[in-house]
Protein backbone atom coordinates (compact mmCIF):
# COMPACT_ATOMS: atom_id res chain seq x y z
CA UNK A 1 0.00 0.00 0.00
CA UNK A 2 1.29 3.44 -0.92
CA UNK A 3 0.73 6.22 1.59
CA UNK A 4 1.33 9.88 0.77
CA UNK A 5 2.56 11.87 3.77
CA UNK A 6 2.21 15.65 3.70
CA UNK A 7 3.65 18.25 6.09
CA UNK A 8 1.77 21.49 6.78
CA UNK A 9 -1.28 21.75 4.56
CA UNK A 10 -2.17 25.43 5.15
CA UNK A 11 -5.44 24.98 3.32
CA UNK A 12 -3.84 24.02 -0.01
CA UNK A 13 -6.00 20.94 -0.58
CA UNK A 14 -6.38 21.48 -4.32
CA UNK A 15 -2.63 21.77 -4.80
CA UNK A 16 -1.88 18.69 -2.70
CA UNK A 17 -4.37 16.52 -4.56
CA UNK A 18 -3.15 17.87 -7.92
CA UNK A 19 0.42 17.03 -6.97
CA UNK A 20 -0.49 13.47 -6.01
CA UNK A 21 -2.47 12.98 -9.21
CA UNK A 22 0.45 14.35 -11.23
CA UNK A 23 2.77 11.87 -9.51
CA UNK A 24 0.38 8.97 -10.06
CA UNK A 25 0.23 9.69 -13.79
CA UNK A 26 3.95 10.26 -14.09
CA UNK A 27 4.93 7.07 -12.23
CA UNK A 28 1.96 4.94 -13.31
CA UNK A 29 1.08 4.17 -9.70
CA UNK A 30 -1.80 4.60 -7.28
CA UNK A 31 -1.73 6.30 -3.89
CA UNK A 32 -4.09 4.63 -1.42
CA UNK A 33 -4.08 7.05 1.51
CA UNK A 34 -3.05 10.63 2.34
CA UNK A 35 -1.84 11.61 5.83
CA UNK A 36 -1.58 15.32 6.70
CA UNK A 37 0.49 16.35 9.72
CA UNK A 38 -1.42 19.45 10.79
CA UNK A 39 -2.26 23.05 9.91
CA UNK A 40 -5.00 21.56 7.76
CA UNK A 41 -7.25 24.64 7.98
CA UNK A 42 -10.73 23.15 7.52
CA UNK A 43 -12.32 26.57 7.03
CA UNK A 44 -15.98 26.42 6.00
CA UNK A 45 -16.94 30.09 6.14
CA UNK A 46 -15.95 33.56 7.33
CA UNK A 47 -16.82 32.72 10.94
CA UNK A 48 -14.34 29.84 10.95
CA UNK A 49 -11.56 32.15 9.80
CA UNK A 50 -12.03 34.20 12.97
CA UNK A 51 -11.19 31.07 14.96
CA UNK A 52 -7.85 30.51 13.22
CA UNK A 53 -4.69 31.83 14.87
CA UNK A 54 -3.08 33.61 11.95
CA UNK A 55 -2.44 37.32 11.35
CA UNK A 56 -5.50 39.08 9.93
CA UNK A 57 -3.96 39.80 6.54
CA UNK A 58 -3.23 36.10 5.99
CA UNK A 59 -6.75 34.89 6.67
CA UNK A 60 -7.76 33.36 3.36
CA UNK A 61 -10.65 31.07 2.57
CA UNK A 62 -8.62 28.67 0.41
CA UNK A 63 -10.62 25.76 -1.03
CA UNK A 64 -11.69 23.44 1.79
CA UNK A 65 -15.22 24.87 1.72
CA UNK A 66 -15.72 23.27 -1.70
CA UNK A 67 -15.07 19.83 -0.20
CA UNK A 68 -17.33 20.63 2.75
CA UNK A 69 -20.23 21.76 0.56
CA UNK A 70 -19.94 18.79 -1.80
CA UNK A 71 -18.84 20.85 -4.78
CA UNK A 72 -15.70 18.68 -4.76
CA UNK A 73 -14.83 15.35 -3.18
CA UNK A 74 -11.41 14.31 -1.95
CA UNK A 75 -10.05 11.86 -4.56
CA UNK A 76 -8.03 10.01 -1.89
CA UNK A 77 -9.03 8.99 1.62
CA UNK A 78 -7.43 11.72 3.74
CA UNK A 79 -6.60 11.53 7.45
CA UNK A 80 -5.25 14.54 9.35
CA UNK A 81 -4.38 15.83 12.79
CA UNK A 82 -4.69 19.40 14.00
CA UNK A 83 -1.81 21.84 14.17
CA UNK A 84 -1.59 25.39 15.47
CA UNK A 85 -3.30 27.10 12.52
CA UNK A 86 -6.75 25.56 12.44
CA UNK A 87 -10.42 26.50 12.41
CA UNK A 88 -10.52 25.43 16.04
CA UNK A 89 -14.28 25.88 16.43
CA UNK A 90 -14.96 23.25 13.75
CA UNK A 91 -12.39 20.75 14.98
CA UNK A 92 -13.69 21.25 18.51
CA UNK A 93 -17.02 19.80 17.36
CA UNK A 94 -15.19 16.48 16.85
CA UNK A 95 -13.07 15.91 19.99
CA UNK A 96 -13.03 12.14 19.35
CA UNK A 97 -12.53 12.54 15.61
CA UNK A 98 -14.88 12.45 12.67
CA UNK A 99 -15.48 13.43 9.06
CA UNK A 100 -14.94 17.13 8.32
CA UNK A 101 -15.99 16.48 4.72
CA UNK A 102 -16.70 13.37 2.65
CA UNK A 103 -13.54 11.22 2.53
CA UNK A 104 -11.60 13.58 4.87
CA UNK A 105 -11.21 12.33 8.46
CA UNK A 106 -9.97 14.27 11.49
CA UNK A 107 -8.39 12.22 14.29
CA UNK A 108 -9.62 14.41 17.15
CA UNK A 109 -7.54 15.70 20.04
CA UNK A 110 -5.91 12.27 19.93
CA UNK A 111 -6.95 9.07 18.26
CA UNK A 112 -6.16 5.69 16.72
CA UNK A 113 -7.77 4.20 13.61
CA UNK A 114 -7.03 1.35 11.22
CA UNK A 115 -6.96 1.25 7.44
CA UNK A 116 -6.45 -2.06 5.64
CA UNK A 117 -4.80 -3.46 8.74
CA UNK A 118 -2.40 -0.52 9.21
CA UNK A 119 -2.72 1.00 12.69
CA UNK A 120 -2.48 4.80 12.67
CA UNK A 121 -2.34 6.99 15.77
CA UNK A 122 -2.02 10.72 16.21
CA UNK A 123 -2.18 13.70 18.54
CA UNK A 124 -3.28 17.19 17.52
CA UNK A 125 -1.85 20.57 18.49
CA UNK A 126 1.47 21.76 19.84
CA UNK A 127 2.99 21.62 23.31
CA UNK A 128 2.95 24.57 25.71
CA UNK A 129 3.78 23.85 29.33
CA UNK A 130 1.46 26.50 30.81
CA UNK A 131 -1.64 24.84 29.32
CA UNK A 132 -0.55 21.20 29.43
CA UNK A 133 -2.34 20.20 32.64
CA UNK A 134 -5.50 22.21 31.98
CA UNK A 135 -8.73 20.88 30.56
CA UNK A 136 -10.26 21.63 27.17
CA UNK A 137 -12.14 24.67 28.49
CA UNK A 138 -12.10 26.87 25.39
CA UNK A 139 -15.18 27.58 23.31
CA UNK A 140 -15.98 30.16 20.63
CA UNK A 141 -16.06 33.06 20.37
CA UNK A 142 -12.42 32.82 21.41
CA UNK A 143 -10.39 35.55 23.06
CA UNK A 144 -6.92 36.43 21.80
CA UNK A 145 -5.61 33.98 24.40
CA UNK A 146 -8.00 31.07 23.98
CA UNK A 147 -7.74 31.12 20.18
CA UNK A 148 -4.19 29.91 20.86
CA UNK A 149 -4.65 27.76 23.93
CA UNK A 150 -7.40 25.85 22.10
CA UNK A 151 -4.77 23.99 20.08
CA UNK A 152 -2.33 23.31 22.91
CA UNK A 153 -1.76 19.64 23.78
CA UNK A 154 -3.27 18.48 27.07
CA UNK A 155 -1.90 15.87 29.45
CA UNK A 156 -5.13 13.84 29.35
CA UNK A 157 -4.53 12.99 25.67
CA UNK A 158 -0.95 11.91 26.36
CA UNK A 159 -2.12 9.85 29.33
CA UNK A 160 -4.71 8.02 27.23
CA UNK A 161 -2.22 7.27 24.46
CA UNK A 162 0.25 5.90 27.00
CA UNK A 163 -2.27 3.21 27.97
CA UNK A 164 -1.84 1.57 24.55
CA UNK A 165 0.05 -1.73 24.45
CA UNK A 166 -0.57 -3.07 20.95
CA UNK A 167 2.03 -2.28 18.23
CA UNK A 168 1.62 0.99 16.31
CA UNK A 169 2.50 1.22 12.63
CA UNK A 170 2.25 5.00 12.12
CA UNK A 171 2.00 7.93 14.50
CA UNK A 172 1.37 11.57 13.59
CA UNK A 173 2.20 14.72 15.54
CA UNK A 174 2.39 18.33 14.44
CA UNK A 175 5.45 19.40 16.41
CA UNK A 176 8.52 17.19 16.60
CA UNK A 177 9.32 14.94 19.54
CA UNK A 178 12.00 16.68 21.56
CA UNK A 179 15.49 15.18 21.04
CA UNK A 180 14.66 13.45 17.75
CA UNK A 181 17.19 15.67 15.99
CA UNK A 182 19.96 13.75 17.79
CA UNK A 183 19.09 10.69 15.69
CA UNK A 184 19.49 12.35 12.30
CA UNK A 185 21.93 14.61 10.51
CA UNK A 186 22.03 17.71 12.72
CA UNK A 187 24.66 19.30 10.55
CA UNK A 188 22.38 19.37 7.54
CA UNK A 189 19.39 20.45 9.64
CA UNK A 190 21.25 23.41 11.09
CA UNK A 191 22.60 24.31 7.68
CA UNK A 192 19.01 24.78 6.55
CA UNK A 193 17.71 26.26 9.82
CA UNK A 194 20.61 27.83 11.66
CA UNK A 195 18.30 29.60 14.11
CA UNK A 196 17.49 26.18 15.63
CA UNK A 197 21.09 25.81 16.80
CA UNK A 198 20.75 27.07 20.36
CA UNK A 199 17.57 25.10 21.03
CA UNK A 200 19.12 21.95 19.57
CA UNK A 201 22.23 22.37 21.72
CA UNK A 202 20.07 23.03 24.79
CA UNK A 203 17.77 20.13 23.85
CA UNK A 204 14.69 22.37 24.09
CA UNK A 205 13.48 22.16 20.48
CA UNK A 206 10.31 20.14 20.07
CA UNK A 207 7.66 18.67 22.34
CA UNK A 208 8.59 16.75 25.51
CA UNK A 209 5.08 15.26 25.51
CA UNK A 210 5.60 13.87 21.99
CA UNK A 211 9.01 12.56 23.06
CA UNK A 212 7.40 10.73 25.97
CA UNK A 213 4.91 9.15 23.57
CA UNK A 214 7.68 8.17 21.17
CA UNK A 215 9.49 6.28 23.91
CA UNK A 216 6.30 4.54 25.04
CA UNK A 217 4.51 3.76 21.76
CA UNK A 218 7.62 3.07 19.64
CA UNK A 219 5.81 3.16 16.28
CA UNK A 220 7.40 1.92 13.08
CA UNK A 221 6.96 5.37 11.53
CA UNK A 222 6.53 8.80 13.09
CA UNK A 223 5.59 11.74 10.84
CA UNK A 224 5.62 15.43 11.84
CA UNK A 225 5.58 18.92 10.34
CA UNK A 226 5.49 22.37 12.04
CA UNK A 227 9.13 23.45 11.61
CA UNK A 228 8.88 23.73 7.82
CA UNK A 229 11.92 21.67 6.94
CA UNK A 230 12.41 18.08 5.78
CA UNK A 231 14.33 15.98 8.26
CA UNK A 232 14.75 12.21 8.61
CA UNK A 233 15.99 10.25 11.60
CA UNK A 234 16.27 6.64 12.70
CA UNK A 235 15.82 5.82 16.38
CA UNK A 236 16.71 2.40 17.79
CA UNK A 237 14.75 1.93 21.00
CA UNK A 238 16.26 0.51 24.16
CA UNK A 239 14.21 -2.58 24.96
CA UNK A 240 14.13 -4.84 27.97
CA UNK A 241 16.00 -8.14 27.92
CA UNK A 242 14.13 -10.74 25.90
CA UNK A 243 12.05 -8.22 23.94
CA UNK A 244 12.28 -7.85 20.18
CA UNK A 245 14.27 -4.68 19.38
CA UNK A 246 12.14 -1.89 17.93
CA UNK A 247 13.07 1.10 15.81
CA UNK A 248 11.22 4.18 14.61
CA UNK A 249 11.75 5.87 11.28
CA UNK A 250 11.04 9.57 11.77
CA UNK A 251 10.24 11.98 8.96
CA UNK A 252 9.32 15.65 9.14
CA UNK A 253 8.14 17.47 6.03
CA UNK A 254 7.85 21.06 4.84
CA UNK A 255 4.79 23.16 4.05
CA UNK A 256 2.98 23.08 0.71
CA UNK A 257 4.84 25.65 -1.37
CA UNK A 258 6.70 25.53 -4.70
CA UNK A 259 10.23 24.10 -4.54
CA UNK A 260 9.64 22.75 -1.02
CA UNK A 261 9.88 19.14 0.20
CA UNK A 262 6.34 18.84 1.48
CA UNK A 263 5.27 15.39 0.25
CA UNK A 264 6.68 11.87 0.36
CA UNK A 265 5.32 8.47 -0.63
CA UNK A 266 5.92 5.54 1.74
CA UNK A 267 5.31 1.86 0.99
CA UNK A 268 3.54 0.04 3.82
CA UNK A 269 2.71 -3.61 4.24
CA UNK A 270 -1.01 -4.13 4.74
CA UNK A 271 -3.60 -6.85 5.09
CA UNK A 272 -5.12 -7.41 1.63
CA UNK A 273 -8.07 -9.21 3.22
CA UNK A 274 -9.17 -6.05 5.02
CA UNK A 275 -11.80 -3.82 3.38
CA UNK A 276 -10.84 -0.44 1.92
CA UNK A 277 -12.55 1.54 4.63
CA UNK A 278 -11.56 3.27 7.84
CA UNK A 279 -12.05 1.20 10.99
CA UNK A 280 -12.17 1.89 14.72
CA UNK A 281 -9.37 0.61 16.94
CA UNK A 282 -10.84 -1.47 19.76
CA UNK A 283 -8.01 -0.87 22.23
CA UNK A 284 -8.30 2.90 21.78
CA UNK A 285 -12.08 2.87 22.22
CA UNK A 286 -11.68 0.80 25.38
CA UNK A 287 -9.23 3.37 26.75
CA UNK A 288 -11.68 6.18 25.96
CA UNK A 289 -14.40 4.40 27.92
CA UNK A 290 -12.13 3.65 30.87
CA UNK A 291 -10.84 7.24 31.17
CA UNK A 292 -14.10 9.13 30.62
CA UNK A 293 -14.26 10.20 34.28
CA UNK A 294 -10.84 11.86 34.04
CA UNK A 295 -12.06 14.62 31.73
CA UNK A 296 -11.49 18.21 32.84
CA UNK A 297 -13.29 21.03 31.04
CA UNK A 298 -12.01 23.92 33.19
CA UNK A 299 -8.86 26.01 33.05
CA UNK A 300 -7.75 24.60 36.39
CA UNK A 301 -4.69 22.36 36.35
CA UNK A 302 -5.32 18.65 36.74
CA UNK A 303 -2.87 15.84 37.47
CA UNK A 304 -3.26 12.47 35.80
CA UNK A 305 -3.33 9.37 38.06
CA UNK A 306 0.07 8.02 39.09
CA UNK A 307 1.33 5.09 41.10
CA UNK A 308 2.10 7.28 44.10
CA UNK A 309 -0.40 6.02 46.65
CA UNK A 310 -2.86 8.85 45.99
CA UNK A 311 -4.97 7.15 43.32
CA UNK A 312 -7.08 4.01 43.48
CA UNK A 313 -6.31 3.34 39.82
CA UNK A 314 -3.51 4.57 37.62
CA UNK A 315 -3.21 1.81 35.02
CA UNK A 316 -5.93 2.03 32.36
CA UNK A 317 -4.44 -0.42 29.89
CA UNK A 318 -7.03 -2.74 28.41
CA UNK A 319 -7.60 -6.48 28.66
CA UNK A 320 -8.94 -8.65 25.85
CA UNK A 321 -12.21 -9.00 27.72
CA UNK A 322 -12.64 -5.22 27.83
CA UNK A 323 -12.01 -4.96 24.10
CA UNK A 324 -14.62 -7.65 23.47
CA UNK A 325 -17.11 -5.59 25.46
CA UNK A 326 -16.41 -2.61 23.21
CA UNK A 327 -16.92 -4.81 20.18
CA UNK A 328 -20.32 -5.76 21.59
CA UNK A 329 -21.14 -2.07 22.05
CA UNK A 330 -20.44 -1.58 18.35
CA UNK A 331 -22.60 -4.52 17.34
CA UNK A 332 -19.46 -6.25 16.06
CA UNK A 333 -19.17 -3.60 13.33
CA UNK A 334 -15.87 -1.71 13.59
CA UNK A 335 -16.30 0.23 10.35
CA UNK A 336 -16.33 3.98 10.96
CA UNK A 337 -19.69 5.11 9.56
CA UNK A 338 -19.67 7.64 6.72
CA UNK A 339 -22.07 9.89 8.62
CA UNK A 340 -20.78 13.32 7.66
CA UNK A 341 -23.38 16.07 7.57
CA UNK A 342 -23.24 19.80 6.91
CA UNK A 343 -23.72 21.63 10.22
CA UNK A 344 -23.35 25.27 9.24
CA UNK A 345 -23.63 27.63 6.29
CA UNK A 346 -20.87 27.34 3.71
CA UNK A 347 -18.88 30.17 2.19
CA UNK A 348 -20.42 31.68 -0.93
CA UNK A 349 -17.83 33.54 -3.04
CA UNK A 350 -20.66 35.44 -4.74
CA UNK A 351 -22.13 36.60 -1.45
CA UNK A 352 -19.42 36.82 1.23
CA UNK A 353 -20.59 37.37 4.81
CA UNK A 354 -17.65 39.07 6.51
CA UNK A 355 -19.65 39.75 9.67
CA UNK A 356 -20.51 36.07 10.15
CA UNK A 357 -19.76 34.99 13.71
CA UNK A 358 -18.17 31.67 14.72
CA UNK A 359 -20.48 28.83 15.67
CA UNK A 360 -20.20 26.32 18.51
CA UNK A 361 -22.28 23.32 17.48
CA UNK A 362 -22.87 19.92 19.02
CA UNK A 363 -21.95 17.78 16.04
CA UNK A 364 -24.28 14.83 15.34
CA UNK A 365 -21.26 12.62 14.61
CA UNK A 366 -19.97 13.17 18.14
CA UNK A 367 -23.44 12.67 19.60
CA UNK A 368 -23.79 9.33 17.83
CA UNK A 369 -20.28 8.20 18.77
CA UNK A 370 -20.77 9.05 22.45
CA UNK A 371 -24.16 7.33 22.53
CA UNK A 372 -22.73 4.08 21.15
CA UNK A 373 -19.90 3.94 23.69
CA UNK A 374 -21.38 5.74 26.67
CA UNK A 375 -18.91 8.63 26.44
CA UNK A 376 -19.24 12.31 27.33
CA UNK A 377 -19.45 14.94 24.58
CA UNK A 378 -16.99 17.61 25.70
CA UNK A 379 -18.93 20.31 23.86
CA UNK A 380 -22.12 19.52 25.76
CA UNK A 381 -20.20 19.46 29.03
CA UNK A 382 -18.43 22.77 28.32
CA UNK A 383 -21.73 24.40 27.36
CA UNK A 384 -23.39 23.16 30.55
CA UNK A 385 -20.45 24.41 32.60
CA UNK A 386 -20.69 27.84 30.97
CA UNK A 387 -24.40 28.05 31.69
CA UNK A 388 -23.85 27.05 35.31
CA UNK A 389 -21.09 29.62 35.59
CA UNK A 390 -23.31 32.34 34.14
CA UNK A 391 -26.02 31.48 36.67
CA UNK A 392 -23.43 31.52 39.44
CA UNK A 393 -22.04 34.88 38.31
CA UNK A 394 -25.56 36.34 38.15
CA UNK A 395 -26.21 35.17 41.71
CA UNK A 396 -22.91 36.65 42.83
CA UNK A 397 -23.75 39.97 41.15
CA UNK A 398 -27.09 40.10 42.94
CA UNK A 399 -25.40 39.37 46.26
CA UNK A 400 -22.79 42.02 45.54
CA UNK A 401 -25.53 44.58 44.95
CA UNK A 402 -27.08 43.76 48.31
CA UNK A 403 -23.94 43.54 50.47
CA UNK A 404 -21.52 45.74 48.55
CA UNK A 405 -19.11 42.94 47.71
CA UNK A 406 -16.85 43.32 44.70
CA UNK A 407 -15.47 39.80 44.84
CA UNK A 408 -15.06 38.01 41.51
CA UNK A 409 -14.76 34.22 41.62
CA UNK A 410 -12.73 34.27 38.37
CA UNK A 411 -13.11 30.56 37.78
CA UNK A 412 -12.41 30.83 34.09
CA UNK A 413 -9.51 33.26 34.18
CA UNK A 414 -6.44 31.89 32.43
CA UNK A 415 -2.96 33.22 32.99
CA UNK A 416 -1.44 33.39 29.52
CA UNK A 417 0.87 36.29 30.13
CA UNK A 418 3.72 34.10 28.92
CA UNK A 419 2.43 34.51 25.37
CA UNK A 420 2.93 38.27 25.38
CA UNK A 421 6.72 37.98 25.25
CA UNK A 422 6.66 36.48 21.77
CA UNK A 423 4.23 38.81 20.02
CA UNK A 424 5.76 40.12 16.82
CA UNK A 425 3.46 42.68 15.17
CA UNK A 426 5.76 42.89 12.15
CA UNK A 427 5.63 39.18 11.37
CA UNK A 428 4.81 38.57 7.70
CA UNK A 429 4.37 34.82 7.71
CA UNK A 430 1.61 32.36 8.53
CA UNK A 431 3.33 31.50 11.79
CA UNK A 432 1.95 33.26 14.86
CA UNK A 433 3.80 34.02 18.05
CA UNK A 434 3.46 30.42 19.22
CA UNK A 435 5.57 29.01 16.37
CA UNK A 436 8.89 27.55 17.37
CA UNK A 437 10.51 28.90 14.22
CA UNK A 438 9.78 32.46 15.27
CA UNK A 439 11.25 31.65 18.64
CA UNK A 440 14.37 30.44 16.87
CA UNK A 441 14.54 33.73 14.98
CA UNK A 442 14.29 35.54 18.30
CA UNK A 443 17.29 33.54 19.51
CA UNK A 444 19.18 34.49 16.37
CA UNK A 445 18.50 38.17 17.03
CA UNK A 446 19.74 37.83 20.58
CA UNK A 447 16.29 37.95 22.16
CA UNK A 448 15.18 35.39 24.76
CA UNK A 449 13.10 32.54 23.37
CA UNK A 450 9.67 32.27 25.01
CA UNK A 451 9.42 28.54 24.24
CA UNK A 452 11.58 27.17 27.02
CA UNK A 453 9.85 28.23 30.20
CA UNK A 454 10.60 25.73 32.95
CA UNK A 455 7.43 24.40 34.55
CA UNK A 456 8.38 22.22 37.47
CA UNK A 457 4.76 21.18 37.95
CA UNK A 458 4.89 19.19 34.72
CA UNK A 459 6.86 16.01 35.21
CA UNK A 460 8.15 14.17 32.15
CA UNK A 461 9.87 11.43 34.08
CA UNK A 462 10.35 9.23 31.03
CA UNK A 463 12.32 11.79 29.03
CA UNK A 464 15.94 10.81 29.13
CA UNK A 465 19.10 12.52 27.96
CA UNK A 466 20.08 10.72 24.80
CA UNK A 467 23.29 8.68 25.00
CA UNK A 468 26.14 9.94 22.85
CA UNK A 469 26.52 6.56 21.18
CA UNK A 470 23.01 6.82 19.75
CA UNK A 471 23.24 10.42 18.62
CA UNK A 472 24.44 11.61 15.24
CA UNK A 473 26.98 14.38 15.65
CA UNK A 474 26.25 17.72 14.06
CA UNK A 475 29.70 17.43 12.46
CA UNK A 476 28.91 14.17 10.68
CA UNK A 477 29.50 14.52 6.97
CA UNK A 478 26.46 12.58 5.82
CA UNK A 479 25.62 13.58 2.29
CA UNK A 480 21.90 13.66 2.79
CA UNK A 481 19.90 12.82 5.88
CA UNK A 482 16.82 12.87 3.71
CA UNK A 483 17.82 9.45 2.35
CA UNK A 484 17.96 7.80 5.78
CA UNK A 485 14.29 6.95 5.81
CA UNK A 486 14.53 5.47 2.33
CA UNK A 487 17.49 3.24 3.22
CA UNK A 488 16.02 1.86 6.43
CA UNK A 489 14.14 -1.43 6.13
CA UNK A 490 11.46 -1.34 3.42
CA UNK A 491 10.58 2.35 3.28
CA UNK A 492 10.84 3.78 -0.20
CA UNK A 493 10.26 7.10 -1.85
CA UNK A 494 7.85 6.81 -4.73
CA UNK A 495 9.68 6.20 -7.97
CA UNK A 496 12.65 4.34 -6.45
CA UNK A 497 14.62 2.56 -9.12
CA UNK A 498 13.35 4.87 -11.80
CA UNK A 499 14.88 8.06 -10.56
CA UNK A 500 16.89 9.40 -7.65
CA UNK A 501 15.49 8.86 -4.15
CA UNK A 502 14.38 12.36 -3.46
CA UNK A 503 11.00 13.52 -2.19
CA UNK A 504 8.60 15.24 -4.50
CA UNK A 505 8.98 18.98 -4.78
CA UNK A 506 6.24 20.99 -6.39
CA UNK A 507 7.73 23.21 -9.08
CA UNK A 508 5.95 26.44 -9.84
CA UNK A 509 6.45 25.86 -13.56
CA UNK A 510 6.04 22.09 -13.51
CA UNK A 511 4.14 20.58 -16.42
CA UNK A 512 3.74 16.88 -16.93
CA UNK A 513 2.48 15.03 -19.91
CA UNK A 514 -0.98 15.55 -18.53
CA UNK A 515 -0.59 19.30 -18.71
CA UNK A 516 -0.86 19.85 -14.97
CA UNK A 517 0.47 23.26 -14.07
CA UNK A 518 1.11 23.62 -10.37
CA UNK A 519 1.38 27.15 -9.13
CA UNK A 520 0.30 28.48 -5.79
CA UNK A 521 -2.52 30.96 -5.98
CA UNK A 522 -1.25 33.14 -3.13
CA UNK A 523 2.43 32.59 -3.83
CA UNK A 524 3.16 36.31 -4.02
CA UNK A 525 2.34 36.74 -0.35
CA UNK A 526 5.21 34.50 0.64
CA UNK A 527 7.88 35.31 -1.94
CA UNK A 528 9.29 38.44 -0.36
CA UNK A 529 10.64 36.98 2.87
CA UNK A 530 9.83 33.30 2.57
CA UNK A 531 13.29 31.98 3.28
CA UNK A 532 14.04 34.22 6.23
CA UNK A 533 10.64 34.04 7.92
CA UNK A 534 9.52 30.48 7.33
From Swiss-Prot:
Chain spans, region Lariat recognition loop: 124-154
Spans annotated as Disordered: 386-439, 469-534
Positions with a binding annotation for a divalent metal cation 1: 8, 10, 228
Residues annotated to bind a divalent metal cation 2: 39, 84, 174, 226
GO BP annotation list: mRNA splicing, via spliceosome; RNA splicing, via transesterification reactions
Subcellular location: Nucleus
CC annotations in GO: nucleus
Compositionally biased tracts (Acidic residues): 388-400, 428-439
Activation/inhibition comment: Active in presence of diverse metals including Fe(2+), Zn(2+), Mn(2+). Also activated by Ca(2+). Binds two metal cations in two adjacent alpha and beta metal-binding pockets.
Cofactor note: Binds 2 divalent metal cations per subunit.
Cofactor names: Fe(2+); Zn(2+); Mn(2+)
Enzyme Commission number: 3.1.4.-
CDD domains listed in its UniProt record: MPP_Dbr1_N
Comp. bias (Polar residues): 413-424
GO MF terms, alphabetically ordered: metal ion binding; RNA lariat debranching enzyme activity
UniProt keyword terms in alphabetical order: Hydrolase, Iron, Manganese, Metal-binding, mRNA processing, Nucleus, Zinc
Stored InterPro entries: Calcineurin-like_PHP_ApaH, DBR1_C, Dbr1_N, Metallo-depent_PP-like
Classification via Pfam families: DBR1, Metallophos
Superkingdom assignment: Eukaryota
Annotated Basic and acidic residues bias: 484-499
Principal localisation: nucleus
Free-text function comment from the UniProt entry: Cleaves the 2'-5' phosphodiester linkage at the branch point of excised lariat intron RNA and converts them into linear molecules that can be subsequently degraded, thereby facilitating ribonucleotide turnover. Linked to its role in pre-mRNA processing mechanism, may also participate in retrovirus replication and have an antiviral cell-intrinsic defense function.
Family membership: Belongs to the lariat debranching enzyme family.
Protein name: Lariat debranching enzyme A
Species this chain originates from: Xenopus laevis (African clawed frog)
Lineage of origin: Eukaryota, Metazoa, Chordata, Craniata, Vertebrata
